[in-house]
């Protein structure tokens, strides 16, 4: 929906603010993706907390409720030419019983960039929730069904893409599973 550059269309009842619902058929993939993002946000209270995040460890859990990152974990880049941004939502501040942490990575550059991921507790793994650069699944995997990152330390984010990762205690990357199996065989 274009507003032809008008940022104050909320107060206009004319073709500038009218929505053409017939465009939904033509843009059904985008419409489905946005519906999934809205549903995902509603199902995780970390993305709609009752109080604004404090960006500090006010519960003495070892991590802040929300932290900002750049291409390097824990090192945000706020200069005007930076085009990469990450945000870590600590699950321990969630009101949900699952206490799942999330990491969002925004690459606004026209080239792919590698992001360092915040470390998770032992036995937990980062799993992809959605990736706007992934066309095969319309960018969104059913919750808990996304690929587990093989490299839990860093991830390549595509050009002009947004990715969301969730902490998953149920799955481990293949390397970790092989290492555990190797230790059992050695015993």
Predicted regions and their residues:
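Carbohydrate-interacting/catalytic domains
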Residues: 1-187
């Amino acid at each position: 929906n274009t507003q032809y550059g008008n940022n104050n269309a909320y107060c206009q009842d004319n073709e500038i603010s009218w929505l053409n619902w017939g465009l939904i058929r033509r843009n059904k993939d985008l419409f489905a993706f946005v519906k999934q993002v809205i549903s995902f946000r509603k199902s995780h209270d970390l993305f709609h907390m009752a109080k604004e995040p404090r960006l500090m460890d006010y519960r003495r859990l070892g991590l802040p409720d929300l932290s900002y990152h750049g291409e390097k974990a824990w090192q945000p880049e706020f200069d005007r030419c930076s085009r990469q941004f990450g945000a870590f939502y600590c699950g321990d501040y969630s009101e949900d019983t699952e206490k799942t942490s999330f990491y969002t990575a925004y690459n606004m550059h026209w080239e792919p960039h590698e992001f360092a991921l915040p470390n998770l507790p032992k036995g937990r793994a980062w799993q992809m929730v959605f990736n706007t650069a992934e066309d095969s699944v319309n960018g969104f995997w059913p919750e808990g069904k996304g690929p587990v990152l093989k490299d839990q330390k860093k991830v390549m984010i595509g050009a002009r893409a947004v990715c969301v990762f969730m902490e998953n205690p149920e799955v481990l990357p293949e390397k970790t599973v092989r290492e555990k199996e190797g230790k059992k065989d050695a015993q």
